[in-house]
């Protein structure tokens, strides 16, 4: 079953992509506020 391999792929994905996305959105928000 491919379901056995799902956590080993999903955990790093969530652990790396979500913080990076959150930091990127926060950075864009701060930059947009300081320029405006």
Curated annotation (Swiss-Prot):
One of its GO terms (biological process) is photosynthesis. SUPFAM superfamilies: Subunit VIII of photosystem I reaction centre, PsaI. Its main location: plastid. Keywords: Chloroplast, Membrane, Photosynthesis, Photosystem I, Plastid, Thylakoid, Transmembrane, Transmembrane helix. It comes from the Eukaryota. GO terms for cellular component: chloroplast thylakoid membrane; photosystem I. It is found in: Plastid, Chloroplast thylakoid membrane. The chain crosses the membrane at residues 10-30. It is a single-pass membrane protein. PANTHER family: PHOTOSYSTEM I REACTION CENTER SUBUNIT VIII (PTHR35775:SF2), PTHR35775. May help in the organization of the PsaL subunit. Belongs to the PsaI family. This is Photosystem I reaction center subunit VIII.
